[in-house]
Amino acid sequence: LGKSFSGVKIRILTFRHPLEEFDNSLAVDVTGKGINSIGEISVSGPVVYTRLIAGDEKAFGGSLTWARDTNDRTTWHRTGDLGYIDVENRIWLVGRKKHRVELSNGVTLYPKQIEPILDSMFDIRTALVNGPNNSQAFIIVENNNQNWKILEDKLKHSIPTLCKLLKNNIDFSFVPFSQSFPVDSGHQAKIRREELSIWLCNK
């Protein structure tokens, strides 16, 4: 995403506790910088809105999207996006908080760390989703004109590259989807991952 600009402050806040004992209303910074310090991208400043209009405030999280710093009493908007700040103070996006996938072995994966790489390498559209018991990292591949067997072989050969980038040995499983991905009615671009997850678990 780049660096923050004048008038807008950005912090990477903690967004959950391993035991789920977590107060979302408190602004607590993630310690450290870099890929191992992923948290919720949060913003504060005069141009940051204080609430959404009418029913949208409740529909999109309401008070859960706000955190308060008890030291300086500033208010921070939790964007719902996860990311980190590197040593050069650049902000990196890894995906939406609700789209992260927590595998049964304790490893957490984020869409933006995987999908853009596969999409650009093979000219396809992919979606990381929650699968049965999350025993594997399930990647759904949207319908395209490529031969699936050939494409699947290429995807499997890319696993070592992905594992190296993620610095983890991940058991990936690639699943073909015979149609176009379901998308939101507004932007016609945001993948409805929950539907893909249900489809996968019912296969």
What are these regions (language model features)?
Residues D29-L103:
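Conserved ATP-binding/catalytic segment of the ANL
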Residues R16-P18, S135, N144, F177-V183:
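Short, internal active-site loops enriched in acidic
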Residues G45, T50-R51, G80-K167:
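AMP-binding/adenylate-forming catalytic core of the ANL superfamily
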Residues T14-R16, I85-D86, S185-G186:
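Short, acidic, Ser/Thr-enriched surface-loop or helix-capping motifs
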Residues V101, L128, P160-K203:
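Conserved C-terminal "lid"/linker of ANL adenylate-forming enzymes
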Residues L1-S37, Q146-K149, K154:
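Conserved adenylate-forming
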